[in-house]
Amino acid sequence: MIEFRLYLVTDRRLVTARPLEDAVADACRAGVRAVQLREKDLDAKSLFELALRLRRIASSSRAALLVNDRADIARAACADGVHCPEGGFPPAVARRILGERAIIGVSTHSLEAALEAEKHGADFITFGPVFETPSKFQYGAPQGLERLRDVATAVRIPVFAIGGTTPERVRMCLDCGARGVAVVSAILGSADIERAVRDFEQAMGGL
């Protein structure tokens, strides 16, 4: 069962003045209960070592750690699960590798992909980009709130809106049926990460 509502996705390029681990620790201390390690440019060894460090931080705050795409590294680092890209590792295969208790998320950018992810055993999906955002420009124009509503209505698993999500936009996403929001720059790009997390918590009425 997915209990979190705010899903932090890492991008260490946004954290230039200190280690990513410190920023994630601040976010978890403020209430984040799920973190996706998404650093696609790192080699396997560096990603594994970072996953180990983030796993310790997440565990100390009772937060879940998911590793983007790499089920092997998620298993080696004893992470809580894996987040599969659209068209990437099938959720059912990821579960065979990580076990039945693993959390399996899937990125989706269309209604068809959302239905496919649910069919193949995803525990939750992200859908977007809902709003315009530089971090998701490669996925094309924003999907918008109506498509988010269509997806949230069509699937029975939790949907997290991603792409340009800010505290001011949270209520619109929840009103469309989203379970919560996935966030990158609005938290990691903030000068006060703990305050940014609290702003999301206030907008959602709890994390």
Task: Describe these PLM feature segments.
Residues 72, 130-131, 179, 186-187:
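Flexible glycine-rich beta->alpha loop in the catalytic core of nucleotide-sugar glycosyltransferases
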Residues 127, 160-165, 181-185:
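Glycine-rich beta-strand-to-loop/alpha-helix junction loops that act as flexible
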Residues 12, 131-133:
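A short, flexible beta-alpha/helix-coil linker loop
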Residues 121, 176-179:
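As written
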Residues 1-89, 96-123, 140, 146, ...:
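Conserved N-terminal beta1-alpha1 strand-loop-helix module at the mouth
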